[in-house]
Amino acid sequence: GSDQQYVVALNKKDGGVAWRTDRTGEMNPNPQLKKSYGTPLILDTNGRPILYSPAADWLYTYDPNTGKELNKLNYGMLGFSIVPRPVAGHGLIYVITSFMRPQLLAIDYLSSNKPSIKWKWNRGVSNQPSAILVGDEIYFVSDSAGMVTCLDAHTGKEHWRERIGGNYSASPLQSNGRIYFHSREGKTTVIEAGKEFKVVSINQLDGQLMASAAVDDQALFLRSDKGLYRIERKRD
């Protein structure tokens, strides 16, 4: 928050505090620029579980059992109120710095004891929707104007950047080689995952889609401000 910055672990059985660790990195003195809402990840790192937690101006690593801070990586005063969930693959963690100066950072967390930035991208990066990693490509959509970018996940090289239109808060979803983008205007655009841009279908629902979609078996659940939709192919 703007007044306190810390990470806390709760006992899942009774809700009690297992540990709490304050953030230690220097931040912008403006309290509003100290906030972060990004969901942490726990990754196996050279044989041990490590908790990776994005924060304003920093990426922290902790021992998930004790809360002990292990390392922190300063990426500069680029972002605050971090919303997107980081994703991991290919020995990298992909972190979006969110508001103020949104960038996508590819952070190497396996090559040494301390994470380091391998590459970064700063064009059309989202503030709220998370990026999505599909195979060797990573995709993200801008909050406004609906610009989708596809990068090589290893190098950060751009494969394509295309406009699908609309404004976005929901994170994209992938299934069976297709990626689904849900706009605030109620439009779902489905594209083929890959190095070439190809739209498969466009569908329209009543109301705004701001929440990310959920999946159960063969059903897709979409929540708009008008209702909850279950979309599923009819079974034989």
Language-model segments: residues:
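Noncatalytic, solvent-exposed loop/strand surfaces
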Residues: 1-236
